[in-house]
Curated annotation (Swiss-Prot):
This is 3-aminoacrylate deaminase RutC. Pfam families: Ribonuc_L-PSP. GO terms for molecular function: deaminase activity. Its EC number is 3.5.-.-. Belongs to the RutC family. It comes from Azorhizobium caulinodans (strain ATCC 43989 / DSM 5975 / JCM 20966 / LMG 6465 / NBRC 14845 / NCIMB 13405 / ORS 571). It comes from the Bacteria.
Amino acid sequence: MTSRAIIPPGSGVPLAPYSPGMQADNVIYVSGTLPFDKDNNVVHLGDAACQTRHVLEIIKGVLEAAGSGMADVTFNHIFLTDWANYGAINAVYAEYFPGEKPARYCVQVGLVKPGALVEIATIAHKRA
């Protein structure tokens, strides 16, 4: 098995010792992605829809850096801080996955930085 870190151009420095993504053979794992700017500040405070879009754009960038894309996503792990934001998160999520939907789960949690409303981790496959 071969593996490599996926670090898109212009990525900020993570808050902890991890890579934004890892590719192992044809499987791509995207780390839990929060609505942070490159300086690890929470963006779009109080707006779950905008935070979700920001997170999914970061994930899209990691996948594209690995030669994959959103259509190749097979599983998403969604963490939200308040079930009241579930509808807003799903509305944006549906825009990024218009065809067959990836498997997923969604749980309510406390996130690592105040103001972050959503975090998503992703598994995708790279097309041969």
